UniProtKB/Swiss-Prot annotation:
This is Ribosomal RNA small subunit methyltransferase G. S-adenosyl-L-methionine binds at residues 71, 76, 122-123, 136. Keywords: Cytoplasm, Methyltransferase, rRNA processing, S-adenosyl-L-methionine, Transferase. GO terms for cellular component: cytosol. It catalyses: guanosine(527) in 16S rRNA + S-adenosyl-L-methionine = N(7)-methylguanosine(527) in 16S rRNA + S-adenosyl-L-homocysteine. One of its GO terms (molecular function) is rRNA (guanine-N7-)-methyltransferase activity.
């Protein structure tokens, strides 16, 4: 995949700084990953797929003033969304020190003033309402709904990055949409869809 070409074909406008930020992010990720094993993705093509996967939702997400990403890991999707949405305050929650340090380093190196890195488990954070809550964590949708309770209200949207099993995980009482792209299923939950 040619990442830049694929991103330019998206039905959205990315900030002028986006491609420079992505390039620097990738350079740092490859260096850090050799020492700290931040992600299982080791080659450029896989990283490019992860980046595309992370930024794709800006084609359908509403504009928002703040976003919480639960379990950001090496930056997917929260950090990538922050680069694509510079007007949105993005809080990245990552309990592992090595990953949180990497996120903090990227924030400082790229001057991402819209990013806040929190090195905690989301369960240990004080409640605060966010307009959008995201997660690419490999846990059940019901668990994500439980973890996000103190961070959303009736107007908030939840965006969970899921695979094929999403259909087995969704409660029919939820108001949701599933946006499918290749093997990815973006589960968008909210009262006002």
């Amino acid at each position: 995949m040619n990442l830049k070409t694929a991103l330019l074909e998206l039905d959205t406008e990315l900030p002028d700084t986006f491609f420079h930020h992505i390039q620097k992010f990738k350079e740092h990720l490859f260096k850090w990953n050799k020492i700290h094993n931040l992600t299982g993705a080791k080659d450029e093509n896989t990283i490019d797929e992860f980046i595309y996967d992370a930024i794709y939702p800006i084609t359908f997400l509403p504009k928002c003033k703040n976003l919480l990403d639960i379990g950001t890991g090496a930056g997917f999707p929260g950090l990538i969304l922050a680069m694509g949405l510079p007007e949105t305050e993005v809080t990245l929650v990552e309990p592992l020190a090595k990953r949180a340090s990497f996120l903090q380093f990227i924030k400082a190196d790229l001057g991402l003033s819209n990013v806040k890195v929190v090195q905690k488990r989301v369960q240990d954070m004080p409640s605060e309402i966010f307009e959008i809550v995201t997660s690419r964590a490999v846990i059940d949708t019901n668990m994500l709904l439980e973890l996000s309770k103190g961070f959303r209200n009736k107007d908030s949207k939840l965006l969970f990055f899921k695979g094929e099993r999403v259909y087995d995980e969704v409660n029919k009482d939820l108001k949701y949409k599933i946006i499918k792209r290749e093997n990815r299923h973006y589960l968008l939950i909210g009262e006002t869809l």
